[in-house]
Amino acid sequence: MITKGQVRLLRTYSYDSNLYTQGLEQLNNNHILLSAGRYGFSKVGVYDLTQEIFSEKIAFPDTVFAEGLTVVEDYFWLLTYKEGVAYKFDKAICNCLGAYPFEGDGWGLAYDKENQCLWMTSGNAFLQKRDPKDFALLDTVLVAIESVPISMLNELEYVDGYLYANIWQTNTIVKLQPDSGKVVATYDISPLLKALNLDKSHYPDLNVLNGIAHLDQQRFLITGKLYPLMLEVVLD
């Protein structure tokens, strides 16, 4: 049985509405590592929760569309959309440590510390299990709700044995078991977005919900592409 999870707003943060948010991950109590996409605008930087300011650390050439990212110990991985390359960066100073080829699109990425692997999405209904050292493909897992495949899996966050995933072009976040691909809960963010007037009538450039960063327990940060706010929520 699929649980319909509850979403509770704790607070909002002012956010840079020029950021086409792709990856979002906590670095420490006050700082969030994030990637922003689009050709000509792709970058990686750090968002300061105390000052509510984004600081750019890496700017990419116009030929690169940055996608999801995830931290693995003292380095982090960054996907590209159509370029077929995953970049490995030093976490402290953002030096590039290598570029690793992969097939297909790059969308979302999360590090599973318990099983020492990466989980990746490509916009379809499959998770890709990858080696966190060299990005080698280890396995693929079909994600489904009651045997119905769920496509357009996007940004990912791994928390206590589960993956939380944005579904592209929706306001839904799903919670799933990565090894089986079974969805165990869904979270509808639509009522919260409506209450905050996060819609096209108030913000014409607003794009889709995207970006999940785990803080602690059931607290998360969520945002979207070209969003003016980042939301701190509880996902029960």
Segments and roles (model prediction):
Residues 1-18, 51-55, 199:
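A short helix->beta-strand "capping" segment at the edge of beta-propeller domains
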Residues 10-43, 58-70, 224-230:
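Beta-strand-rich domains and repeat architectures in extracellular enzymes and scaffolds
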Residues 47-52, 90-94, 131-135, 177-181, ...:
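Short loop/turn segments that connect beta-strands within beta-propeller blades
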Residues 32-38, 76-83, 118-124, 165-169, ...:
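Conserved beta-strand positions in repeat-built beta-propeller and related beta-rich domains
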Residues 52-81, 85-88, 94-108:
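Blade-loop segments of beta-propeller domains
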Residues 17-28, 62-72, 102-114, 147-159, ...:
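Beta-rich, blade/repeat-based domains predominating
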Residues 1-7, 34, 38-49, 133:
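Blade/loop signatures of beta-propeller domains
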Residues 86-146:
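Hydrophobic, well-structured mid-protein blocks that either form specific transmembrane helices
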